[in-house]
Amino acid sequence: MPDEMIEVPCPICQKSVPWINESTFRPFCSKRCQLIDLGEWAAEEKAIPSDTADFAMDPNVSDGWSIK
């Protein structure tokens, strides 16, 4: 049985990307698309959804790094 090549769409431009070791930027098609995605995460345009409250904003929660 011959190996089937798996292809995935680039998350940024939707170009088809072969899922092989030689695809350096997978799942992205290029360094450009990889950096665009990184920029979106850094600018907080993307986020992982969560049902929990943001504990970092709770003044009653200590991280142990407060200066006294």
From Swiss-Prot:
Organism of derivation: Haemophilus influenzae (strain 86-028NP)
Function: Inhibits all the catalytic activities of DNA gyrase by preventing its interaction with DNA. Acts by binding directly to the C-terminal domain of GyrB, which probably disrupts DNA binding by the gyrase.
InterPro entries for this protein: DNA_gyrase_inhibitor_YacG, Znf_NHR/GATA
Top-level taxonomic group: Bacteria
NCBIfam families reported in the protein's UniProt record: PRK00418.1
Family listed: Belongs to the DNA gyrase inhibitor YacG family.
Gene3D superfamilies documented for this protein: Erythroid Transcription Factor GATA-1, subunit A
SUPFAM superfamilies named among the record's database cross-references: Glucocorticoid receptor-like (DNA-binding domain) (SSF57716)
Keywords, ordered alphabetically: Metal-binding, Zinc
Annotated GO biological process: regulation of DNA-templated transcription
Pfam families named in the record: YacG
Subunit structure: Interacts with GyrB.
Name of the gene: yacG
Protein name: DNA gyrase inhibitor YacG
Cofactor annotation: Zn(2+)
Cofactor note: Binds 1 zinc ion.
